[in-house]
From Swiss-Prot:
PROSITE patterns: RIBOSOMAL_L39E
Superkingdom classification of source: Archaea
Keyword rRNA-binding: yes
The species this protein was found in: Haloarcula marismortui (strain ATCC 43049 / DSM 3752 / JCM 8966 / VKM B-1809)
Gene name linked to the record: rpl39e
A single Gene Ontology CC term: ribonucleoprotein complex
SUPFAM superfamilies in the record: Ribosomal protein L39e
InterPro entries (UniProt xref): Ribosomal_eL39, Ribosomal_eL39_CS, Ribosomal_eL39_dom_sf
Function: Binds to the 23S rRNA. Forms part of the polypeptide exit tunnel.
Official protein name in the record: Large ribosomal subunit protein eL39
Lineage: Archaea, Methanobacteriati, Methanobacteriota, Stenosarchaea group, Halobacteria
Biological process per Gene Ontology, one example term: translation
Length: 50
């Protein structure tokens, strides 16, 4: 549990941003063809390799 470098923080911020659901407007636009974000990651179960 040491200090995080700026690069590590940036990568973690990107992973946090990617870990969101598919927006509702995308589901509407694609007529529910896109329903799930298959890259969702649980903070405890899945590793980020970071």
């Amino acid at each position: 549990m040491g200090k995080k470098s700026k690069a590590t923080k940036k990568r973690l911020a990107k992973l946090d941003n990617q870990n969101s659901r598919v927006p509702a407007w995308v589901m509407l636009k694609t007529d529910r063809e896109v329903q799930r974000n298959h890259k969702r990651r649980h903070w405890r179960r899945n590793d980020t390799d970071e």
